[in-house]
């Protein structure tokens, strides 16, 4: 079973979940707001994608983040800022069975789950 990490009311997460369901791929949602977020997951995601890819700079959370925090964000501070602000994480994320996907791109999903 595939675990999709994200937030259930996110449109991009909804697209990914619908795509998985339409292709009969067993999956479950790990909602950051409901199920929490641990440092181990963030560390794995950072290793796969890099901290700068994990940060969703188009999010409302990013726009509302203190300028000093934004300007000082780097590899050493990113994970703690993301842990404190899970809606700042680009989503959805799938890290499972050698698959590492972030965001939703139908072609990438087709290639990963073919």
UniProtKB/Swiss-Prot annotation:
Disulfide cysteine pairs (residue numbers): none
Active site: 10
InterPro entries documented for this protein: Arsenate_reductase-like, Thioredoxin-like_sf, Tscrpt_reg_Spx/MgsR
Pfam families noted in UniProt: ArsC
PANTHER family xrefs: ARSENATE REDUCTASE (PTHR30041), PROTEIN YFFB (PTHR30041:SF8)
Family indicated by similarity: Belongs to the ArsC family.
Name of the featured protein: Uncharacterized protein HI_0103
Organism: Haemophilus influenzae (strain ATCC 51907 / DSM 11121 / KW20 / Rd)
């Amino acid at each position: 079973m595939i675990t999709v990490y994200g937030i259930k009311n996110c449109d991009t997460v909804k697209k990914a979940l619908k795509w998985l369901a339409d292709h009969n791929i067993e999956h479950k949602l790990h909602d950051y707001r409901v199920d929490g977020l641990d440092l181990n997951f963030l560390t794995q995601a950072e290793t796969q994608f890099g901290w700068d890819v994990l940060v969703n700079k188009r999010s409302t959370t990013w726009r509302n983040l203190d300028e000093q925090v934004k300007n000082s964000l780097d590899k050493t501070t990113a994970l703690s800022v993301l842990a404190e602000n899970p809606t700042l994480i680009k989503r959805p994320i799938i890290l499972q069975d050698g698959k590492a996907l972030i965001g939703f791109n139908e072609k990438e999903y087709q290639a990963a789950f073919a």
